[in-house]
């Protein structure tokens, strides 16, 4: 109540919307290198991180270092991951090209990793195929059946049917896996 005393309320149904957090599937150390996106603050951090990488690439003299700054890896090809790589591609190809002098933002390498056999795993197969075609058409590298097995501040290694591959790049964003929030776990 207004004087900070508890108030008893009656109800027929109580809905507790405690939210969710990221699940790194037992690889919690990945959180340091691939932040997730579940809150508005996460989204703002991700936006700022992406834009700052273009700035860092602009300042880099070494072509290999520049390529690392312009490499963006998104882990998880559900709706969040698919939308995110699409937005990064739009930024790189449409929004940012006139803003930089020493880099071509269209050279950005955008990679989408998914552990399942297709993008948008729970959706209809026609939508999955269409989405993959669209993403590849805008320059996104799509790797399905691919699991992140190691990462640090400069690279990610993943295992796929083709074997282990390492991608050097400074930006990794976690869009895979959802876990109950700490409050929801307590209530369960």
Predicted feature locations:
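A Rossmann-like FAD-binding core segment of flavoenzymes
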Residues: 89-188
């Amino acid at each position: 109540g207004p004087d900070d005393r508890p108030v008893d309320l009656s109800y027929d149904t109580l809905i507790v919307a405690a939210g969710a957090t990221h699940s790194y599937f037992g690889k919690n150390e990945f959180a340091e290198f691939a932040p997730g996106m579940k809150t508005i603050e996460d989204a703002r951090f991700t936006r700022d991180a992406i834009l700052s990488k273009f700035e860092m690439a602009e300042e880099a003299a070494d072509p290999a270092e520049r390529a690392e700054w312009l490499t963006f890896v998104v882990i998880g090809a559900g709706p969040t991951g698919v939308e995110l790589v699409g937005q990064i591609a739009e930024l790189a190809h449409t929004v940012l090209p006139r803003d930089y002098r020493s880099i071509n933002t269209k050279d950005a390498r955008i990679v989408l990793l998914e552990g399942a056999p297709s993008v948008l795993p729970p959706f209809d197969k026609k939508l999955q195929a269409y989405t993959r075609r669209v993403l590849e058409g805008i320059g996104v590298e799509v790797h399905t059946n691919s699991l992140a097995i190691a990462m640090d501040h400069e690279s990610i290694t993943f295992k796929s049917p083709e074997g282990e591959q390492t991608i050097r790049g400074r930006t990794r964003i976690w869009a895979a896996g959802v876990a109950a929030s700490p409050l929801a776990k307590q209530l369960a």
